């Protein structure tokens, strides 16, 4: 085998044959090879103090290599080297100084070993110079110039006194360091500590109120160990306070501030200490001059490695291969910064007469998990006899991956739940197998070992020799905790658990345990749960937690036993009684709060109250109420006692214990309060908690419940009621749960919802579409599809409610509304009412102004043009009519979805096309029976029948339309203006409905000149217009416009609708309802397409109209069809009905009735009329507004009358 010994950066490969050499012999061979490699002069020498593993473990020179290292392993040589000696000086002037090799070996060699860099030589680099690395590397009896004469003799290192002061002097500096690492020694009380520190440093006392010091500091890194020892003054500003008062000089180091040692504090921590100190009136600083820097660095290292060696005499045990008397160990030369390693290693080598070490045996060195495992020195050998039964030996093995140098050591991997191993209880996972049935397995492969074990027959006994390192299954010993190393019943809870065992494949409880041993006294402090194995019995039970101390198992107390005995007792009890009962009873001690290392309290652990809250909460989450009762005794005072849990679990894991599978942090938090035994005041006193308790009764107001995002964003709708209650009880802001009310809207994003909630600060509130973008889609969607809420919005304009309560959003929120708080909703509605009312008032004013301007323009315009425009607009709602519609909508409070007009227009076009296609078919079928039907319905129908009978009817209509279409539209448009005013003015138009309907049906459109005048008259609501309309009708018949009757009827229906619309105002509720329905239809149908007019035209017979008007008005059919089938179905129906109504077939009249109900929303009808015209001629149809003008100008184009047909 071969071993590589590293001298700094130089590696020396030493062949070791079969590994039978001792470590001391390896050291000598490595040294010889290294000297050859260096090729230095005769005065150059190197001394190796010891060899270490790469992780810091020290090898015993007496060990055999095969037992402690593997082939091709790397070892680190802790050595010192010296250039040829020259002039010898002793600046200290101490008569004890000697230049003999003995003195050199005893003092200097030991000291150099402590600070010699890994590279084997001191490298002076620019960075080192900036950090103030001194170039004088030899002092005292070293044959080189020493430090300046101002160095005090006690600080130098003459024989006899140098080490006496060097070793202890660092103890003061390392006081906090030792606390951090749990290294408690009597050096802390050594009187020489302060003396030594004062010898090397100077004290500077400054006032914290004098302003900034004007110094530039960087971390003070030790050139020997690389540790941070304080703050290095890199520069001083000119004209600064430090410069003026001469407080500091460049290259000095601040190592202590107000009795706070800066050793091993990070730069940020040191700066913070400095800042805090400057806030006090007086600041006491210990400043290290550049010349004493190395001495200070060495002393810091020395104290870590020679505990209590302060008698001035080097009475230390030196490794055999090195004959010097140095007990100092090179600190962290291997690149490891673990003071614990240094401490344990030095303890192994040194025996201090001044510091009695209780527990006589030194702690085992820290080794890598596998390297050196099972050696004579590092582990104890245990012989275990396992009787092979029907279930086998009951364990599995694993080997280290060592493909480079052959098979590695073989370890026990798992103990199976059944078999000889679990019954015996002694074999553990991680044990290294050395022998099987007397045969050495070192160097054998895993397959060979398995074959050897399987060769044991059932009933025979397999004899195993295993090596077990205590440190392998017991935790790294906690750093010194002399006064608080064990949990006490007074400061912790005693819990009893009955945990059922399972057959999940894991042995026993499924927990990994750790123990603690006091470094100072060496006594065992008990065993604790280090971790819970996933899938094991404890994991499934969910009540055990990390760092619980086991004090009894199945009624057998573990207190007073050593850690090893307690482990054996636990293992035996679980394997025997536990397996028999299927249940394990555990009594544990659980500390109420999880501590955190506090370097200021002598290694004591303390943690904010939050940790206590967290643990208590977790406890209540994981345990039954009966088990939680002991928590009731926990008080905030108990939390602040800073209990120390004597296991390294606290130091190892800074994060809270992982939640059990039964309660994930974000899911089961509401269960915290369910434990009756735990008073919320115990763990919710005054700290801010990052958990949210869903039970409001347990929530003090002082707690800021910043619920986790996972909880906020994914609330459970089933808890909305309780959350609503909580909102009223707790003043805290819980915006997460309120989102549950908005879950019904799939288009909204959680973020927008959260943003909205924050804005409104109302727990259950319907989002305003204009406030939150995420809900805009829903609003527009509703607006486009459901017109049923347009009417109610009219009421909103009066200040009765908000848009969101009636429009499409109302439907979205219908789910959440019942869940919400009615009071909150009322408040919200009121607030929104005020805003809405103001907005709508402004809109109304604007709308009124626009309407007035329009009226003025219209008055100035040619009456014929005005009528045409209105007629076209009424039918298609294009161009100017759009604005009219907007103004009217504003007046009525229905102007909500103006932005959707384009979409509606597109839909309207599609529906027109469909209606047109169907219209053509119906025309042909119904034309035949139209005469008979019309004759039966109206006396004047014979004229219409003639037109319909005529195959050129549609064309004739077009020819006639130019005039009649204008009339038709004229009459409807003025009535519209009038009716709109009427309904609001309350003028009664209902009595004239019958006459008007009949007249409109046939007379409405034929007369252009008369219609405008008539239109003005109908506005007034007089009977004169009816007479004129009749005259127009007869005149049209005479002129040979048979279709005019139909067209008139159809147009009249639209006009009639307009008139009827005004009538609803006077009618009262019924009319209002009708009007609302008509309005809705009006808003929807016109956009959807004007199909109703056609229906009305055929059904136009005056008698029919009159009869239908009354029933239809009461009927809600018109309203319903527009709502439900608003876009297409209604139009289709209308189309079908229109044709039947126009034509004699009986089914048509049946449809007529419902359609006429729809007819009231005449505006839609007009629109549909153009659709019909378009149907007749798809080309012109596209531009409905254009069609009308064309009709007027060119008789060949389709007329509105044709569309009506």
Swiss-Prot record:
The keyword Phosphoprotein applies. CDD domains: PDZ1_Par3-like, PDZ2_Par3-like, PDZ3_Par3-like. It is found in: Endomembrane system; Cell junction; Cell junction, Tight junction. Highly expressed in kidney, lung and skeletal muscle. Expressed at intermediate levels in brain, heart, placenta, liver and pancreas. Isoform 1 is predominant, while isoform 2 and isoform 3 are expressed at lower levels. Residues 83-104, 137-165, 318-374, 707-743, 784-921, 1111-1205 are annotated as: Disordered. The modification Phosphoserine is found at residues 100, 346, 352, 368, 635, 710, 728, 730, 746, 749, 801, 1184. Keywords: Cell cycle, Cell division, Cell junction, Membrane, Phosphoprotein, Repeat, Tight junction. The keyword Cell cycle applies. Residues 356-374 have a biased composition (Low complexity). One of its GO terms (biological process) is establishment or maintenance of epithelial cell apical/basal polarity. Residues 329-352, 806-822 have a biased composition (Polar residues). Its main location: membrane. One of its GO terms (cellular component) is cell cortex. PANTHER family: PARTITIONING DEFECTIVE 3 HOMOLOG B, PARTITIONING DEFECTIVE 3 RELATED. Putative adapter protein involved in asymmetrical cell division and cell polarization processes. May play a role in the formation of epithelial tight junctions. The N-terminal part (1-351) part blocks the association of the tight junction marker TJP1 with the cell-cell boundary when it is overexpressed. This is Partitioning defective 3 homolog B. It comes from Homo sapiens.
């Amino acid at each position: 085998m071969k071993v590589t010994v590293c001298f700094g950066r130089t590696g020396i490969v030493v062949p070791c044959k079969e590994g039978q050499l001792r470590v001391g012999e390896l050291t000598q061979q490595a040294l010889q090879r290294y000297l050859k490699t260096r090729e230095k002069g005769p005065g150059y020498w190197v001394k190796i103090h010891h060899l270490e593993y790469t992780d810091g473990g020290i090898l015993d020179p007496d060990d055999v290599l095969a037992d402690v290292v593997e082939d091709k392993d790397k070892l680190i040589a802790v050595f010192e080297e010296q250039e040829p000696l020259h002039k010898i000086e002793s600046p200290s002037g101490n008569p004890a100084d000697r230049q003999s090799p003995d003195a050199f070996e005893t003092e200097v060699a030991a000291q150099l070993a402590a600070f010699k860099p890994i590279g084997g030589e001191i490298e002076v680099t620019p960075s080192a110079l900036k950090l103030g690395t001194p170039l004088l590397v030899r002092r005292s009896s070293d044959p080189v110039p020493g430090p300046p004469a101002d160095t005090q003799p006690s600080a130098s290192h003459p024989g006899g006194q140098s080490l006496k002061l060097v070793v202890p002097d660092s103890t003061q500096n390392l006081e906090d360091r030792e606390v951090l690492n749990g290294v408690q020694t009597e050096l802390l009380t050594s009187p020489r500590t302060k003396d030594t520190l004062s010898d090397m440093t100077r004290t500077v006392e400054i006032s914290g109120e004098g302003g900034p010091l004007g110094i530039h500091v960087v971390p003070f890194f030790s050139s020997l160990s690389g540790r941070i020892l304080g703050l290095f003054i890199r520069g001083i500003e000119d004209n600064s306070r430090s410069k003026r008062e001469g407080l500091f000089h460049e290259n000095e180091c601040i190592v202590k501030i107000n009795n706070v040692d800066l050793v091993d504090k990070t730069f940020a921590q040191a700066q913070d200490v400095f800042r805090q100190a400057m806030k006090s009136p007086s600041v006491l600083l210990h400043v290290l001059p550049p010349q004493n820097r190395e001495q200070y660095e060495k002393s810091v290292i020395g104290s870590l490695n020679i505990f209590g060696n302060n008698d001035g005499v080097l009475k230390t045990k030196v490794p055999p291969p090195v004959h010097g008397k140095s007990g100092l160990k090179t600190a962290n030369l291997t690149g490891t910064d673990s003071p614990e390693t240094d401490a344990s290693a030095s303890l192994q080598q040194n025996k201090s007469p001044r510091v009695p070490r209780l527990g006589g045996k030194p702690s085992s060195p820290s080794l890598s998990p596998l390297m050196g495992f099972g050696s004579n020195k590092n582990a104890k050998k245990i012989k275990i006899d396992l009787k092979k039964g029907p279930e086998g030996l009951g364990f599995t093995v694993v080997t280290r991956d060592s493909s480079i140098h052959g098979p590695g050591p073989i370890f026990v991997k798992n103990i199976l739940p059944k078999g000889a191993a679990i019954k015996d209880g002694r074999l553990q996972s991680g044990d290294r197998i050395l022998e099987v049935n007397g045969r050495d397995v070192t160097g054998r492969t895993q397959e060979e070992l398995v074959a050897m074990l399987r060769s044991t027959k059932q009933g025979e006994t397999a004899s195993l020799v295993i090596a077990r390192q205590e440190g392998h299954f017991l935790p790294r010993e906690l750093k010194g905790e002399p006064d608080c190393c064990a949990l006490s019943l007074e400061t912790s809870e005693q819990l009893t658990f009955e945990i059922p065992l399972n057959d999940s494949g894991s042995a026993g409880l499924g927990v990994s345990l750790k123990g603690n041993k006091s470094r100072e006294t060496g006594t065992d402090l008990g065993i604790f749960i280090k971790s819970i194995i996933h899938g094991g019995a404890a994991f499934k039970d969910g009540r055990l937690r990390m760092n619980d101390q086991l004090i009894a198992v199945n009624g057998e107390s573990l207190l007073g036993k050593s850690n090893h005995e307690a482990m054996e007792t636990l293992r035996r009890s679980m394997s025997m009684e536990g397996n028999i009962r299927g249940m394990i009873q555990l009594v544990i001690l659980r500390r109420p709060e999880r501590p955190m290392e506090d370097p200021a309290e002598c290694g004591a652990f303390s943690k904010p109250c939050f940790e206590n809250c967290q643990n208590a909460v977790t406890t209540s989450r994981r345990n039954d109420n009966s088990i939680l009762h002991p928590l009731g005794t926990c008080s905030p005072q108990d939390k602040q006692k800073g209990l120390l849990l004597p296991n390294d679990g606290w130091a190892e894991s800074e994060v809270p214990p992982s939640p059990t599978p039964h309660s994930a942090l974000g899911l089961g938090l509401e269960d915290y309060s369910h434990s009756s035994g735990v008073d919320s005041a115990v763990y919710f006193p005054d700290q801010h908690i990052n958990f949210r308790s869903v039970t409001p009764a347990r929530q003090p107001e002082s707690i800021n419940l910043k619920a986790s995002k996972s909880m906020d964003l994914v609330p459970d709708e089933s808890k909305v009621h309780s959350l609503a209650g909580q909102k009223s009880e707790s003043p805290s802001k819980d915006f997460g749960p309120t989102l549950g009310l908005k879950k019904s809207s799939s288009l909204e994003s959680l973020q927008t919802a959260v943003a909205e909630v924050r804005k409104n600060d109302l727990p259950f509130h319907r989002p305003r579409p204009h406030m939150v973008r995420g809900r805009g889609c829903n609003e527009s969607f509703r607006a486009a599809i459901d017109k049923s809420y347009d009417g109610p919005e009219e009421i909103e304009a009066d200040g009765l409610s908000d848009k969101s309560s009636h429009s499409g959003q109302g439907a979205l929120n219908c789910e959440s509304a019942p869940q919400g708080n009615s009071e909150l909703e009322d408040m919200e509605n009121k607030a929104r009412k005020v805003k809405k009312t103001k907005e709508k008032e402004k809109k109304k004013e604007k709308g009124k102004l626009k309407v007035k301007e329009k009226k003025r323009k219209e008055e100035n315009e040619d009456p014929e043009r005005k009528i045409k425009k209105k007629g076209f607009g009424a039918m298609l709602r294009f161009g100017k009519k759009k604005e009219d519609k907007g103004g009217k909508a504003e007046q009525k409070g229905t102007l909500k979805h103006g932005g959707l007009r384009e979409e509606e227009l597109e839909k309207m076009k599609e529906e027109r096309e469909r209606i047109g296609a169907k219209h053509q078919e119906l025309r042909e079928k119904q034309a035949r029976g139209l005469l008979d039907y019309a004759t039966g319905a109206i006396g004047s129908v014979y004229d219409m029948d003639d037109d319909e009978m005529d195959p050129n009817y549609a064309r004739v209509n077009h020819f006639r339309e130019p005039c009649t279409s204008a009339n038709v539209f004229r009459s409807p448009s003025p009535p519209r203006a009038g009716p709109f005013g009427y309904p609001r003015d309350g003028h009664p138009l209902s009595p004239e409905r019958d006459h008007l309907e009949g007249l409109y049906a046939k007379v409405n459109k034929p007369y252009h000149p008369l219609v405008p005048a008539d239109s003005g008259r109908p506005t007034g609501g007089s009977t004169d217009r009816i007479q004129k309309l009749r005259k127009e009708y007869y005149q049209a018949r005479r002129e040979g416009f048979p279709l005019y009757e139909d067209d008139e009827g159809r147009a009249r229906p639209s006009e009639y609708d307009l008139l009827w619309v005004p009538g609803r105002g006077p009618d009262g509720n019924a009319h209002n309802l009708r009007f609302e329905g008509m309005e809705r239809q009006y808003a929807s149908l016109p956009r959807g397409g004007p199909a109703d007019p056609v229906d009305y035209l055929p059904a136009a017979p005056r008698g029919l109209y009159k009869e239908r008007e009354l029933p239809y008005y009461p009927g809600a059919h018109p309203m319903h069809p527009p709502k439900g089938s608003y876009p297409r179905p209604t139009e289709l129906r209308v189309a079908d009905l229109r044709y039947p109504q126009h034509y004699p077939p009986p089914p048509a009249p049946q449809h007529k009735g419902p359609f006429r109900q729809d007819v009231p929303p005449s505006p839609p009808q007009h629109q549909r009329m153009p659709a019909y015209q378009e149907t007749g001629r798809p080309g012109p149809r596209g531009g409905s507004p254009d069609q009308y003008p064309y009709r007027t100008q060119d008789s060949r184009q389709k007329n509105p009358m044709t569309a009506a047909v």
